[in-house]
Amino acid sequence: MSVNIKTLNAFIATVILAVGILSCKDDSGNNIPEANYEVTIENVSESYPILKSDVFAVPVGATDPAPIGPGGAYEFEFTAPEGSRLSLATMFVQSNDWIYSFGEDGIALYNEDGTKVTGDVTSQLDLYDVGTEEDQEPGTGSNQAPRQSGTDTGSVDDNENVRLVDDMELPSNDEVISVTLTSTSKYGFKVRIENVSTSNTLQTSEGGKPVPLSPGVWLVHPASQNALLFTVGAPDYGEGLEAIAEDGMPDELAGNLSDKTGLTVPLSPGTFAIYEGMNPLFQEGESSSANGLEKLAEDGIIDMLVSFLSSESNVSARGGFAKPVGAGQAGPLLPGDQYKFTFTARQGDKLTFATMYVQSNDLFYSPVEDGVPLFSGSEPISGDITDQVRLWDAGTEENEEPGVGGNQPLRQTEPDTGPEDPNTNVRLVNDQYNYGNTSDRIKITIQQVMN
């Protein structure tokens, strides 16, 4: 799932510019080992064009994959955020290489006013020739799935471009297929694909015939991502659509779509503190006080928390990181980008920091509660410290499905929206959702630097 630029810019607008490091260190002539450090926070997650995808293959009431004939249906369910679109493909089985699809862009799942699209959406389907096999008379050809000797038979099409089927003798789409959307929850949908053909719907030189529909694929994606299945006027991508269009076999395409499917997770600007004793950001199992952690965890806003750290007597240095390396302005950390910050610490000091998991309501990455000791004995530490980082729930807002919830920064109408969490304690994330492995989202490295 790629990140929508409009909503990303709105999120950036809530973020303050980078906050400089503040220090109140006083060595007082003590010969305590001291070192200068640079910390790099890298977003190592992937950027995905598709949020969700899968196959539909088992007819309603059946236990095994199969085509659907007259009266048969496929059903599948998913959740999707506002702004999402649905694409799919299923074979017109009495053909050489035709599919029903919602086109390059898919169809909107939400209306402009934010309400969900429900009901019959068959009128938005079209019948496409994928351009991979020469056409024969529909319902009679020897290289069509019901009659061919094996998969992938038939001559190559002289016109290899994907295009609308132009055959006035065919039944209308709504005489063959019906697609309906039903709301199942606040963000949930059920799709029903029904074969409404009869034994005589397709009129051929051999008489009337039904039109089976094949197993296929579906995908949910943002409006900014289109032409994920095909481009009209261009050849098939070679990723498996041909196998559906010619033989009703979705697995190859489903596998390739799966590689492009997932949740793109930006990280927010954040704060850090160098301290002794108790962690100044939070205590596990206790409510996050009005120190500004809520603003960071819910909206990626860091100024209040940095200001709070300035008043903590056990904090020797603190600051904010807000501008990605190489960027011209403050903003979220997208996949592949880095934040960096530097500080000076001495033996006995520890590091803590916090950065928001932006596709959430109030989650943040931070080290274990005890922080990261910056010296091993008298030697400064160096290297990858990601294994000491955890995903925490601030306990300030009720969790929604990551990347879907309407009260998360990329989709909320304004900061600080969403119902309160009934459990107000800061805790390690432990709910029904999948946030991915920490090491697949964020990488933290620290190194000693010389003046």
Where in the sequence are the language-model features?
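Bacterial N-terminal signal peptides
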Residues: F11-G20
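Mature, soluble, non-transmembrane domains
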Residues: G71-T184, G326-N451
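Bacterial N-terminal signal peptides that target proteins for export
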Residues: S2-I12
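Short, ordered beta-strand-loop transition motifs
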Residues: F11-I12, S183-K186
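Structured domain cores in non-transmembrane regions
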Residues: N31-K116, K186-G188, S197-E369
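Bacterial Sec-dependent N-terminal signal peptides
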Residues: V19-N36
